[in-house]
From Swiss-Prot:
The chain crosses the membrane at residues 10-30, 51-71, 80-100, 106-126, 151-171, 186-206, 210-230, 240-260. Pfam families: TauE. The keyword Membrane applies. Belongs to the 4-toluene sulfonate uptake permease (TSUP) (TC 2.A.102) family. Its main location: membrane. Keywords: Cell membrane, Membrane, Transmembrane, Transmembrane helix, Transport. It is found in: Cell membrane. It is a multi-pass membrane protein. This is Probable membrane transporter protein YrkJ. The lineage of its organism: Bacteria, Bacillati, Bacillota, Bacilli, Bacillales. InterPro entries: TM_pro_TauE-like, TSUP/Inactive_protease-like. The keyword Kinase does not apply. It comes from the Bacteria. GO terms for cellular component: plasma membrane.
C-alpha cells in the first residue's frame, strides 16, 4: 500500500461520508462501488468484494457509534425496539458476515446489485411515520414485535454479507411498515445499525476479510466528512443530489448485473 492508494481511499471515503451525511443514506451503499472500481480504474490497487465489505463494516461501526453517542441522552432510543430488533439484527449480521467468507465474489456483487436497486427505489418513497406525535422516554411505542424481529434478522444477514449497517432499508421499514414515530426511528435505527455493524465487524475480522489500514483511513474520513455533509444538507435542497446519486447507484447496479449475466 503506497501513498497513491491511501490518497485515493481518503478521497473516496470523504466523498462517500459527505454524501451520506448530506442526504441521510447509509455510507456503505455509496462506498461499495467506489471502493470496488475506482482504485483499480486509476491503477493504484485492486480490492476484492470481500475486502471492500470488510472495510465497509469497520467504517459503519465507527460512523454509527458517533450517532448513538450523540443521541444517548435524548430519550428517543427506544429500549423495546433495541431488544427485539437490535438482538435480531446482531444475530443476523454475525451469521451473514461469517458465512460471507464462503460466498463467491460474484455472489456478493449479486447481493449488492439487488440492494442497490432497492436503495434507488427507497430514495424516492416519501418517508411516512407518525410525524404529528411527540414522544417522551416514558411513552410506549406500539409495534408488531415478531414482524420487527424477523425483518431485522433478514436485514442483518444481508447487511452482514456486504459489511453494511442496513440503515437505508431499516429506516423505511420502521416508518412505513412498523409505523414507528419519526424521531424514535431516527435515534433507534442508529442504535440498531450500530449493533448490526458490531456483528458484521466481528464476522469479517474472524474470517480475515478486513484490511485494517484502508479501514482506518475510511474511519477517519467518515468522522471528518459526515458531520460536514450533515451541516450542508440542512442548508441546501438535496433532491437533485438524490436524483444524481440514484442514477449513479443504478448505473453501478446495471454494470454489476451485466458482469454477472
Amino acid at each position: 500500500m503506497d501513498i497513491a492508494f491511501i490518497t485515493t481511499l481518503f478521497i473516496i471515503g470523504f466523498i462517500g461520508a459527505f454524501i451520506s451525511g448530506m442526504i441521510g443514506i447509509g455510507g456503505a451503499v455509496i462506498n461499495y462501488p467506489m471502493l470496488l472500481y475506482i482504485p483499480s480504474l486509476v491503477g493504484v490497487m485492486s480490492l476484492t468484494a470481500h475486502e471492500v465489505s470488510g472495510i465497509g463494516a469497520i467504517q459503519v461501526f465507527f460512523a454509527t457509534l458517533g450517532g448513538v453517542w450523540a443521541y444517548r441522552k435524548s430519550g428517543l432510543i427506544n429500549k423495546t425496539l433495541i431488544i427485539y430488533m437490535g438482538s435480531s439484527i446482531l444475530l443476523g449480521s454475525v451469521l451473514g458476515s461469517y458465512f460471507s467468507h464462503y460466498i463467491s465474489e460474484k455472489g456478493i456483487n449479486f447481493i449488492y446489485g439487488i440492494l442497490a436497486i432497492i436503495a434507488v427505489i427507497l430514495m424516492f418513497i416519501p418517508k411516512k411515520g407518525q410525524k404529528g406525535q411527540e414522544h417522551s422516554e416514558d411513552k410506549e411505542v406500539i409495534f408488531n414485535k415478531w414482524l420487527a424481529s424477523s425483518l431485522a434478522f433478514i436485514i442483518g444477514g444481508v447487511s452482514g454479507i456486504l459489511g453494511a449497517g442496513g440503515a437505508f432499508i431499516l429506516v423505511p421499514i420502521m416508518l412505513s411498515i412498523l409505523n414507528i414515530p419519526v424521531r424514535v426511528t431516527v435515534a433507534s435505527s442508529l442504535a440498531i445499525t450500530f449493533l448490526s455493524s458490531i456483528g458484521a465487524t466481528v464476522g469479517k475480522v474472524i474470517t480475515g476479510q478486513v484490511l485494517f489500514v484502508p479501514a482506518l483511513v475510511l474511519m477517519i474520513t467518515s468522522l471528518i466528512a459526515s458531520p460536514i455533509g450533515a451541516s450542508v444538507g440542512q442548508k441546501v435542497n438535496t433532491k437533485f443530489l438524490q436524483w444524481v446519486l440514484a442514477q449513479l447507484i443504478g448505473a453501478t447496479a446495471i454494470k454489476i448485473w451485466l458482469e454477472l449475466l
